[in-house]
């Protein structure tokens, strides 16, 4: 593949944080360390997941604000497509009403994505994209693709990052299957 083994493990670790799977987090942390990742790279990876976890509710605030305005004006809220629209007006409205919280978010956003132990290309274009897909945020996906192109990401790297996200999402289900089967066993033993 086009992405190094270490970077794949770091992308997987970011995705593990997005799925909130403690087993996946432990496993991917060990695999990332074994692939040569440093503690600093792992810490930056967690911050990328945190940033994208913020991204979905941030972008979706546009839906809430648009609906608020439409409902206050007694307009229909069932027409149009939220995912293809330009959310800039509602995001600006959100910024205006957020006070100093938006300034703090902006500082966090810039710090998370600046070059550090991990490259902007990995953080914005690949790790960010994988997390955005798991956050199911169309606008986050769009911005990660835009940023990734600016950082030189190629389509093969994007598809590898997406595949990592898919595997990690399924991995969270697999890792928690034991809980399900434990409940099944307990329930069946009570009925016998």
Residue ranges and their predicted role:
Residues 1-192:
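Hydrophobic alpha-helical segments
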